[in-house]
Every structure is written in C-alpha cells, then in structure tokens.
Design a protein with these regions (language model features):
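Beta1/beta-strand and adjacent pyrophosphate-binding region of the FAD-binding site
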Residues: 2-18, 37
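Nucleotide donor/acceptor-binding cores
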Residues: 8, 33-34, 143
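Predominantly flavin-linked oxidoreductase catalytic cores and closely associated redox partners
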Residues: 15, 25, 29, 105-239
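Flavin (FAD/FMN) cofactor-binding and adjacent substrate-gating region
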Residues: 57-89, 96-97, 104-108, 122-127, ...
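Flavin (FAD/FMN) cofactor-binding core of flavoprotein oxidoreductases
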Residues: 238-247
Length: 247
C-alpha cells in the first residue's frame, strides 16, 4: 500500500472470519462502479484454526466443509447426553481451506482489494460525508467503514472471556467415535473457571481436542496442554506414546 490513497466506497477493518466473509461477498456483488478495501495487520494467512458452524442456512462454504456430524454429545456429572438431527449438521472447515476460498475470490475481483500488513489506527468522520482512516502506511477515505475488530473497550469491560487451546491428535489405535462430536464435556477440573473439553473426531484415530474456559483471565499455555494430556489419558486411556502426531 502506498502513502497516497484514492477514495473508496467501503473499507473493511480487520481480515478475520467476519471481515473476510464480508469482503468476499463484496468482491462478488459490488458493481464495477464501486470499490472496497480490506485492511489487515497480518502479513499472510496460515492454517492457524478451524471454523465450525451449524448448517442452518447456506453461507457459501459448502465446498470448504471437510467433516459433518449429525450427532453431538454433552457430558456432565458422569452422564453423557447425545442428540441427533436429520435436518441440520455440525460442520467443520479447516482454516487453510477457508482462507484460500476467501482470498481467491478477493484476489480475482476488480472491485475489492486486500491490503495485508496494514493496521488501521484511527477513524474520523469528515464534513464531506467520508470517513478518514489513518493507517501505518498513510491515509484512506471511505464512504462506509465496517470495523470487524474486537472493541478494546468491550474486551476490557468484559467480566468473562472464552479462551482455549486445541491439539490436532493422531493416534496409533482407534479411540474416537467419528459419528459424534463432543460439544462440551464438563467432567474435567473446574478450579480455573467454567471448563469443558471439546472434541472434533475426524476418524477413529484423528481428532481435534480443545480445553476451553469461560473465565476472567487467560491462562498460561501449559495449563491448557496439561488438561488435554490428562483428558486423553483419562477419557480415552491414551498414552502420549500412542498419540503419534500432535499439532
């Protein structure tokens, strides 16, 4: 991005899931007479997470879905409650597939452009009806600004955060039930706040296992990892030697 910017119709601040989905839709739908930019601080995208959702309606990600489950479970107090739907599925999209689809559409657009390595620092309305956006590479003006970034004020005021660490685990023997996703297993230690394990079973020998908390404070990485280790041992009688590939 150069220091001299032209006016645009729409500026999207932040290229996370929300910002990318909005920008991909703009890239497909904006008429040639209009323009949009996406400002994202990171320099590139990598497979850093998974995206899961209920397929209540078509959100344009069908070709990215890698796994679907029509059964899900909740475990609490030593009892497992399993539900099933013939209508809706719980869907899993790998981060790299999601990013590839979004960026491919944006990169191929004549109306929407992605600017990586660019941080929006300040947004101020102007008397012209435009908004001026100050970035670390200069200024841009836009008729409409969609800020998809978390509000620092809201984060600071929040009394409860959701925070987690997940492992992608492959095992030497079958231990997972690939027909049922574990949305919440509360039969785990609770001393650091509301805590549950979340399991996406891709096969009998492969799953994503996450230690998830709702609490005020984020914990050290080793705390989550120790809970995941303990869960693999206690829930699946799985030794770390049998977990041959952990990411």
């Amino acid at each position: 991005m150069t220091k001299t910017f032209h006016d645009v119709d729409i500026a999207v601040l932040g290229g996370g899931m929300t910002g990318l989905m909005m920008s991909e839709a703009l890239a497909r739908r904006l008429p040639p007479s209009q323009s949009a930019v996406v400002l994202e601080p990171r320099d590139g995208y990598e497979h850093d997470r998974t995206f899961c959702f209920w397929d209540v309606e078509d959100i344009g990600l069908e070709d990215c879905i890698q796994h679907k489950w029509q059964k899900w479970s909740l475990r609490v107090g030593g009892e497992e409650h399993v539900a099933e739907s013939k209508t809706y599925s719980y869907c899993h999209v790998p981060g790299d597939a999601f990013y590839k689809k979004m960026l491919s559409t944006i990169d191929g657009s004549s109306t929407t452009s992605m600017h990586l390595g660019t941080t929006a620092r300040d947004v101020s309305p102007q008397s012209s009806g435009f908004c001026r956006i100050e970035t670390d590479h200069g200024e841009i003006t836009a008729k409409h600004v969609f800020d998809t970034r978390p509000s620092p004020a809201l984060v600071e005021a929040s009394t409860t955060l959701q925070h987690f660490v997940g492992w992608h685990v492959r095992t030497t023997r079958p231990v997972f039930d690939p027909t049922t996703v574990t949305l919440m297993d509360f039969d785990v230690p609770q001393e650091h706040g509301l805590h549950f394990m979340y399991v996406l079973p891709f096969s009998e020998t492969e799953a994503v296992v996450e230690s998830t908390f709702f609490s005020r404070d984020v914990l050290a990485p080793e705390v989550y990892e120790n809970y995941i280790r303990g869960y693999l041992i206690g829930r699946y009688q799985l030794t770390l030697e049998e977990a041959t590939d952990i990411e």
